[in-house]
């Protein structure tokens, strides 16, 4: 198997190229103009590095079923556009109020707040441009399932709803169950969708789709838990964003509730859960197992 780090980097380049092409100055059918400042802000927010982990999960779950990888990349690019829009909005003064993202000024710092809001809005629509493009050759029912799943994972009952719960938690502290729900929505929903999408693309069985959904839920919680540990134990240079923000904002996290050592123990448990869920897929799931390990051992 090709070195995991190289695989992840290769995928990041490919997804970056797809997003770069979509965010060119070329006016597409149905558009009137592409304002240069808005386009520059979108490019700043989406082409500023990143691991592209969510697209990687779409592609690698699709490989389990020998699905069309070009289609999986397209779905992955759509998902990454939504993820990047969420980061732009998350960094705004009204929310996390952060100056750095991936070691560079956040979009509202590089441009202004209004432009950052609109850049995020436009990236959200780009996602559905990817999925509805007739160049993406998909069965209509599969396409609709992908669009519907992404909309629900990103919206009221998923990522956006989780962000609201996160803001509310600054003043009204949730218990452990409430924090897990918050994190499953804010962070986990898009990761779970990434793992489901590969199965949807392949028209996999309900059992396989549900198994991958559970895998996505486990690594989604692990991702957020690892993030919360890093916020406490790492520094701004290593993270590429301001360290210690959760403590300063008095945010409700499992690390704040139980401590770092408890969190590290939980991460190992989630890793085992993720591995167990992949057993039926045999050696074809080795890269997904490596991805789960990467999530809990990453440094940023």
Regions found by a protein language model. Name each.
Residues 1-27:
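N-terminal amphipathic/basic leader segments beginning at the initiator methionine
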Residues 7, 20, 32-277, 283-296:
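Mg2+-dependent prenyl diphosphate-binding active-site environment of isoprenoid biosynthetic enzymes
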């Amino acid at each position: 198997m090709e070195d995991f780090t190289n695989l992840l980097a290769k995928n990041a380049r490919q997804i970056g190229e797809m997003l770069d092409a979509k965010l060119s100055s070329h006016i597409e059918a149905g558009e009137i103009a592409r304002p240069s400042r808005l386009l520059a802000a979108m490019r700043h927010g989406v082409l500023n590095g990143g691991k592209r982990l969510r697209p990687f999960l779409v592609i690698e779950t699709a490989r389990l079923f020998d699905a069309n990888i070009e289609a999986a990349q397209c779905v992955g690019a759509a998902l990454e556009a939504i993820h990047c829009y969420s980061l732009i909005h998350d960094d705004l003064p009204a929310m996390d109020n952060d100056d750095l993202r991936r070691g560079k000024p956040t979009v509202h710092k590089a441009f202004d707040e209004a432009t950052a809001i609109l850049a995020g809005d436009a990236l959200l629509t780009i996602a559905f441009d990817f999925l509805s493009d007739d160049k993406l050759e998909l069965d209509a029912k599969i396409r609709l399932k992908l669009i519907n799943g992404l909309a629900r994972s990103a919206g009221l009952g998923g990522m956006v709803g989780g962000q609201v719960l996160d803001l509310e938690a600054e003043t009204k502290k949730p218990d452990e169950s409430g924090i897990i729900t918050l994190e499953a929505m804010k962070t986990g929903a898009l990761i779970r969708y990434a793992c489901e999408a590969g199965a949807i693309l392949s028209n996999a069985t309900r059992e396989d789709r549900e198994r991958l959904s559970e895998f996505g839920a486990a690594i989604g919680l692990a991702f957020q838990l690892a993030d919360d540990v890093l916020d406490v134990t790492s520094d701004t240079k290593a993270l590429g964003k301001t360290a210690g923000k959760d403590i300063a904002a008095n945010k409700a996290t499992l690390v704040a509730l139980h401590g770092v050592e408890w969190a590290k123990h939980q991460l190992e448990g989630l890793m085992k859960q993720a591995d167990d869920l992949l057993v039926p897929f045999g050696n074809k799931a080795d890269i997904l197992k490596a991805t789960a390990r990467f999530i809990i051992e990453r440094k940023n």
